[in-house]
């Protein structure tokens, strides 16, 4: 007996897909299988749990049972999928198997932990489950080391600092947010973090961690050591591709899909943080929302390609929030930066003076939507 559409995963991508399918078809069988509890929570909230004093259970918005009842679903929480038999169209776990007509991989991405001695002492905050496992340690920690100065690392550094903790942030790059924007643009946030008391160790490398009687000793390059109570890895995400690889699907950085979210197997699709769409991995909310809308149509028999417009990325650093869009990481752009007390507007233009990217901060963020309209598609 077929289970209709089977979705592996229960995060934001999977839930958006379910909601979009049910808007168009109330009865088609939908089965979700996931290794977690399947309770709903807002993942971006993890960047602010410490300053807001939230426990892991406080993040739950809807239980798995409520979700199943609302959308007429068959749910299998706490279930590890071990294999996909693509030829037979069967998903397998240790104790069960499910026949499918169409299969969607929404397996997400896992936090990358740098391969240094003592890496097992590093914590990650990529899910409610991960936060639940370490919330007591993080709440009690006075000294926190954050490894990675990208989007999540910068958000966490500000949040822990706002909670009154002594925060050190270490990154190989010469500036924070180095993979997103040039240093002349990120310097405003970098200065604000320093003003707040975050100790920035840039152009620096973590070489190892060791448990001590009074905490964790972090060994850095140039014969430096610091002692902290907790170490958080914020060094990026890696799409979960192991299951897709075992199924014989085409893999690059993520599970490769085309504009229809279809993998190299015509009956298997991928969505969200695990997917690589025409060569791009886009682990942000808006592209996932748009992808879920298109995939729902395609699973129900339409043939709709995904067309992604220029989209905003929000950096949730409350003391100095940023919005950015476009090709902010391009090396050949000229940046025109207008800085005022109430905020910044940075425009990245090409050789033809065409706007290709922008970053806005604080009160100037209201200008983002006007700038967004002028970016090329």
UniProtKB/Swiss-Prot annotation:
Pathway annotation: Nitrogen metabolism; nitric oxide reduction
What is the similarity comment for this entry?
A: Belongs to the FAD-dependent oxidoreductase family.
Q: Membrane spanning segments where? A: none
Under the heading NCBIfam families, the entry gives: PRK04965.1 (NF003437)
Reactions that this protein is recorded to catalyse: 2 reduced [nitric oxide reductase rubredoxin domain] + NAD(+) + H(+) = 2 oxidized [nitric oxide reductase rubredoxin domain] + NADH
> Enzyme group, top EC level?
oxidoreductase
What cellular component terms from Gene Ontology apply here?
A: cytoplasm
Quote the HAMAP family the UniProt record gives: NorW
What biological-process terms (Gene Ontology) are attached? cellular response to nitric oxide; nitric oxide catabolic process
Q: Which Pfam families match?
A: Pyr_redox_2, Rbx_binding
Among the GO molecular function terms of this UniProt record, one is: rubredoxin-NAD+ reductase activity
Question: What is the annotated role of this protein in its UniProt record?
Answer: One of at least two accessory proteins for anaerobic nitric oxide (NO) reductase. Reduces the rubredoxin moiety of NO reductase.
The protein in question is named Nitric oxide reductase FlRd-NAD(+) reductase
Task: Please name every pair of cysteines joined by a disulfide bond in this record.
Answer: none
Which Gene3D superfamilies does this one have?
3.30.390.120, FAD/NAD(P)-binding domain
Q: Tell me the superkingdom of the source.
A: Bacteria
Supply the induction statement: Submicromolar concentrations of NO induce anaerobic expression. Repressed by oxygen in the presence of NO.
Note the InterPro entries from the entry: FAD-bd_OxRdtase (IPR050260), FAD/NAD-bd_sf (IPR036188), FAD/NAD-binding_dom (IPR023753), NO_rdtase_NorW (IPR023961), Rbx-bd (IPR041364)
Cofactors needed by this protein, per the record, are: FAD
EC number of the protein = 1.18.1.-
